[in-house]
């Protein structure tokens, strides 16, 4: 449980530090890390999480339906988060604090749900935490654009980092245990959607980007190797 709390929190802190002290490298680094983390998250979901769900003897059609529900839920969340989960959120100056609050709230829900299947799943925990680094970079930037102080922006990131472990903690409640596989299926749908969007989005002008393809391939290979 210590890892479940510490690693996601460390990930968002790292994202803030990279944004604060490495401004010149942020854009390129963020895109490469998105490619790697999205590929790794999608691959771990396909290699580990989905097989585990379907091996539990539950109604496969129901599990499949809930996974589809997770995909739909993520689509709805992204209409509010402006695509921050895969690196495309933009905040106009006119949006201000209210615009940031809307994006943060959607990411808050996203982070809570993605924490549900993490307890005891080291590989999935690693995948989610890696994915949090570029999201934290985006969220920190948006917070500053919304005229939050650096301390307030950092505080928002700490809260964002803690909500994922909270999602994992609720699975220890007796009344939640019965529904955990179904909640995991909902999370799987979210992972599939986010990972696929990152994996299949094109460069501007559909240009060939060898570095990004290499990062995507490395994410797949790492997931296969440890899975």
Go through each PLM region and give its residues.
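Intrinsically disordered, metal-sensing/regulatory segments
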Residues: 1-227
């Amino acid at each position: 449980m210590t890892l479940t709390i510490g690693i996601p929190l460390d990930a968002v802190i790292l994202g803030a530090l990279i944004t604060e002290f490495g401004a010149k490298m942020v854009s390129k680094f963020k895109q490469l890390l998105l490619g790697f983390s999205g590929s790794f998250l999608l691959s771990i979901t396909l290699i580990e999480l989905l097989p585990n769900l379907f091996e539990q003897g539950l109604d496969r059609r129901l599990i499949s339906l809930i996974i589809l529900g997770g995909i739909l839920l993520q689509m709805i969340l992204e209409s509010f988060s402006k695509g921050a989960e895969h690196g495309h959120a933009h905040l106009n100056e006119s949006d201000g604090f209210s615009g940031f609050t809307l994006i943060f709230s959607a990411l808050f829900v996203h982070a809570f749900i993605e924490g549900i299947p993490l307890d005891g799943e080291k590989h999935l925990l690693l995948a989610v935490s890696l994915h949090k680094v570029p999201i934290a970079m985006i969220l920190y930037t948006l917070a500053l654009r919304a005229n939050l102080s650096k301390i307030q922006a950092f505080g928002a990131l700490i809260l964002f980092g803690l909500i994922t472990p909270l999602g994992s903690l609720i699975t220890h409640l007796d009344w939640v245990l019965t529904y955990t596989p179904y909640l995991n299926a909902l999370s799987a749908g979210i992972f599939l959607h986010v990972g696929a969007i990152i994996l299949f989005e094109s460069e501007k002008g559909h240009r060939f980007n060898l570095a990004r393809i290499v990062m995507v391939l490395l994410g797949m290979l790492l997931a296969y190797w440890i899975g």
